[in-house]
Amino acid sequence: MKVFSVAVCVLFFIMACQSPHSQVLSINHELELVIADYQYYKDHQSPFNRDISGDTNAQLPDLSPSNLEQQYLALKVIYQRLAQVDVGKLSQDEAINHAVLSYTIKNQLDNYINHEHYMPLTAESGFHVWISRINGQVSFKTEQDYRDYLARLAALPKYFSQQMFWMNKGIDEGITQPKIVLQGFEDSIKAFIKTDVTTSTYYQPFSKMPAYFSESLKSQLKTQAAASISEFVIPSYQKYYDYMVQRYQPSARDNIAASSLPNGEAYYLNRLQYYTTLPISVDDVHEIGLAEVARIRLEMDDIITQLAFAGSFADFVNFLRTDKQFYATSSEGLLKEASFIAKKMDAQLPKFFKTLPRTPYGVIEVPANIAPKYTTGRYSGPSRDDQAGNYWVNTYRLDRRPLYVLEALTLHEAVPGHHLQGSLAREMKNVPKFRNSTYISAFGEGWGLYSEYLGVEAGFYQSPYSDFGRLTYEMWRACRLVVDTGMHAKGWSRERAMNFLADNTALSLHNVKTEIDRYISWPGQALSYKMGELTIKKLRNMVELSLGENFDLREFHDQVLKNGSMPLSMLETIIIDYVEKKKVVLKEEKQ
């Protein structure tokens, strides 16, 4: 006992004598321990999160009530430990780690409390689509890789049953997607129900196997794959299709507002503040949206005047929506045009960025099974280091995919938008592993919208129609602030929201419908684009005013992107710190 007492006294003495620097090291180490525990949790929370090979490659996530509760309790402990860290004494790198991890874990806890797992679907997609991408999770190089994959196919019935269990809980508790956004949703399920199993997405790994496999092994694996798809995959999708049509859609809620859900007002405010990363109110977001709509409308009207168009704003928009000159005549033509724009921007990147990613990207079609209800385009990052990223372009209904918005779309989704930003984050060195894969919507989508604006400085939008298309896309994001808050918190109907979006943009009416349904089914996410872009532009303006002729745009962009995704408040702290340090350097250079 005396030895223990002496040891404690010595420990207290050492702690009391610690310098501020050593205290920072101690606090940083404390945070490192929390991060290590979180990473261990994350690696074991889902078999998709592990880097190691073994039994987990043959598993699917366990969505049982007991497992989800255990995950929640484990996260809660980690979050409590994280909250005890003295953020004011952290180094900047560790402060970023703390901010990103706090934001991430809080959302995971909130999602469990708000029963987000009761609704594993949106208007445009769902778990049945997400799980179909398991063939991209691993490299198929060994026989064991294929056998693990076959084991995952055998686990699909349980996985689908667990998802439907939670959806039934949602029905019982009034937590479902609105009925209106589910019209035609069953078609995305039916697309996976194949008569010829060799045409199934799940069969793709067996279509081209390693050349070093013997023919007998290839034949054996193909036979087993066909049997597994017939026995496990197709019946799972058929069961889900029947459930969707016979049970879920008829039982879905009629009210579109998130505020109509149990504890709905608090839930929507939670989603709003999560997706904007800001302590902001519904009313403030709505008013910012209205102000942005009015400002952008003036710029759009100026272009119509410059073109000497005889007619109203509505007439001009109708002209854009219906004139064949603005639409590609083939899927290949649309993809080629998108590819040309992307390559053209590639050549401009060194003018705007000091640091560029190594990861390449391709331009491909949105998969046909989800295209009808899917958004215009999207970026899909690689899931392995032997893959490229992909800029998805929706070629469904070409008469609804105007070319005048393609420059803005491409810059947003490919470069300098999501591909560049996401690849730099994945390629970051000397950061905790979770940072490489963290995506914070306000940061990422804000950067995407800002990237559309960079096209002006890069010499894009030379045609007044494409410039109007750029403004249409900016107006689209401004309208989101209005319609998302309007529908989920202010009693707006779906029709009112559709009319507002249609009246203020040149989006096709098909896109207007799919977009509004997306916002209904994904409360708050649509707010991240404009709120993030406004923050990045505000910070750029602040740096330009502070540094004057010493402002370096390439350096500013590197400062924004070099640390990956983060809450906007943390980004502001970093940029302010950069300016202060830059001023010190400039002052020293003058002496």
Language model segments and positions:
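C-terminal motif of bacterial Sec signal peptides marking the signal peptidase cleavage site
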Residues: 15-16
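N-terminal maturation segment of proteins
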Residues: 19-591
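Sec-dependent signal peptide recognition
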Residues: 2-9
